[in-house]
């Protein structure tokens, strides 16, 4: 709201003051001798200069980090000084690792806010949803940690979505690869991109519950001989797909058939999620929201490209992923 007012050229003093007063209440409740006056003055100046929505979105995390560091007696490190994005806004993994290694070399304990960093020009840039998981993973890799503990509001991963399956069993051990598959298909305990930094460093992740710290949680590892009770480790799924089924007699003997079909989707900027096929049939699964407005154009181009006997559509589908070992 406050930044929206700044964008509209409105007076933001009142809104920002209310936020500052709330933070002061928190500081007082924690019994801290801490003032955020200087930080709020900087925020006001940057809001008025329209520093960007990413800057605005990250200020709560930034201020909470300062308070947490003060409460714990740890050093505060602004993520904008150690988490690096390139000039195009893409995360720069290697540069970030170098900067973090140098920054943390002589620091024993620190608090680093999550989900944002900065581009080369100093402009604040945020990660996508769940970016705090990524920040923790990046720092764990830079520190060459023995383990990355990720504290959340659930006791690790469950074998299925508890909103759909009653009494879903907890997963005690899962591999990076299995987790990537489940996260991509909708399991949302841990941001899928958080796996890459620690995987490079061979660092296991332990998902723990803040509200039940005694629970074992889920260990995420590179590989394991620990076999689950069942062959299936977990099940996850996503909604919102459409299936385009293409039939043509002797399809299997026609050179380049699949390539021609896939080129149609590529030319229209539609990503393909799944592609099962048979001797005379291939089915392409795509995100329905990407396909619906281009539907007739795509169908016409498929007919022109491969002259199929028939093309059928089935909408409002879900894709289910079954992940396991054995």
What residues fall within each predicted segment?
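Nucleotide/pyrophosphate-binding catalytic subdomain
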Residues: 1-190, 195, 287
